[in-house]
Amino acid sequence: RYIDKRIPKILLCHDVIAQRVLRSSSYLMQKICIFSERMSLNLPNAHIFSFSQKDCDLIKQIYHKETNLCLDYIDEQIINKSPDKVEDYFTMFGDWRRKENAEGALWFINTVGPLLRKKVHIKIIGRGFPNKDVKNIVPNLNLDILGFVDDPYKILSQSKALISPLFTGAGIKVKVIEALACGIPVIGTDIAFEGLPPLFNSFMLIA
């Protein structure tokens, strides 16, 4: 509101905060976040963009604001990491300091892991993985916690698939797009695939 009303503005909505808080927050927090987001989107002379048609439609539905669809940028080095070989492991990839990422990964390890009948090797890439919250040693789950990696896309592109168990959050998940750009399939929950067009359905397994 402190910016000159005559100056055109571009607002880029990576995700719709209202959807995120409606899934996981208290009633009071929902009201506060929706009010704050509405104030931001009502800036005068602003042009709103979002990465998915789903979020464009949500902004229209909740805030009655027209939103333009734009594509997320994928670096050329990621696209060029198409797999030259597929090795015998899966990947999990993200900033594990984010609650929704850590909770999903721990759910998979502690709940799905004990059900595995064959040995499965998973390379976990990214900062802040909560090792201490892995409840038990799972016999058929070999976890390789790599932490921060300078070039995660080589590891990603040579894996069998990215595993992305998400139960909260909103917006397009960039790590899912990056995995698809690397040429590998993704195994995830419906929230992991939110906003992606049906064009990619053959590369996505909702589990």
Feature annotation, model-predicted:
Residues 157-171, 182-185:
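Acidic donor-binding loop of glycosyltransferase active sites
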Residues 175-178, 185-189:
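Short hydrophobic beta-strand element within catalytic cores of glycosyltransferases
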Residues 73-80, 84-137, 145-152, 157:
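Conserved catalytic-core segment of nucleotide-activated headgroup transferases in glycan assembly
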Residues 54, 72-73:
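Carbohydrate-associated surface elements
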Residues 17, 27-48:
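Membrane-proximal helix-turn-helix segments that form the acceptor-binding/catalytic region
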